[in-house]
Amino acid sequence: MAKKGKKYQEAASKVDRTQYYSVEEAIKLAKETSVANFDASVEVAFRLGIDTRKNDQQIRGAVVLPHGTGKSQRVLVFAKGDKITEAEEAGADYVGEADYVQKIQQGWFDFDVVVATPDMMGEVGKLGRVLGPKGLMPNPKTGTVTMDVKKAVEEIKAGKVEYRAEKAGIVHASIGKVSFDEEKLVDNFRTLQDVLAKAKPASAKGTYFKSVAVTTTMGPGVKVDTSSFKL
């Protein structure tokens, strides 16, 4: 494993790896120890007490963060008829039908989120092997398969983020940029925390919020004290 640079080592020395910080302290420290020479993303990782091998303990969804993520999302919408105009007026970057299916099959990926109306899923389904591994396949659980394309596009543009528990029960998400005020990052953190708390499967036993960490792109991780987290 490659040794971290001097700048990282200096930043990491400011974080007590044996200590668990309050959400406010963790975010403040993560901002202070950002080593990137650009406006880095502030990321969170929630390790949940779930068994993702069980169908009733799958956690997946989407949430609109009150202050957005600071990242501009390019939205592709698959729709027909009036829904094309609706998507365009809502601010979608690309809107079309089978023409975009062919374009993607040829290697085009200049988009970040895909939305589709239910009547287009027959066509979009052809892209499962391409979009699936990239986490771009539209899904009703995240609100990206819907007839209300206006709402879907507007929410994505406003800062909607998708979340999904990985095999180890870890949910990764971006809650903003280092340039954000600490208060805004805390608001975004709490919004995601509340959504995950409400998503706790009834069959999940034991401690739910096992561990939480805040970090920035290329920065050191800061452990969060979860003892006050409510379900």
Swiss-Prot record:
Instruction: Quote the Gene3D superfamilies the UniProt record gives.
Output: 3.30.190.20, 3.40.50.790
Record key words, sorted: Repressor, Ribonucleoprotein, Ribosomal protein, RNA-binding, rRNA-binding, Translation regulation, tRNA-binding
Q: Name one Pfam family in it.
A: Ribosomal_L1
Tell me which SUPFAM superfamilies the record gives.
Ribosomal protein L1 (SSF56808)
The record's InterPro entries line, in alphabetical order, gives:
Ribosom_uL1_bac-type, Ribosomal_uL1, Ribosomal_uL1-like, Ribosomal_uL1/biogenesis, Ribosomal_uL1_3-a/b-sand, Ribosomal_uL1_CS
PROSITE patterns, alphabetically?
A: RIBOSOMAL_L1 (PS01199)
Molecular function terms, GO-annotated:
rRNA binding; structural constituent of ribosome; tRNA binding
Which Gene Ontology BP annotations are present? regulation of translation; translation
Cellular component, GO annotation: large ribosomal subunit
Family assignment from sequence similarity:
Belongs to the universal ribosomal protein uL1 family.
Q: How does it assemble?
A: Part of the 50S ribosomal subunit.
Summarizing the function annotation, the protein's role is: Binds directly to 23S rRNA. The L1 stalk is quite mobile in the ribosome, and is involved in E site tRNA release.
Q: Can you name this protein?
A: Large ribosomal subunit protein uL1
This protein's species is Staphylococcus epidermidis (strain ATCC 35984 / DSM 28319 / BCRC 17069 / CCUG 31568 / BM 3577 / RP62A)
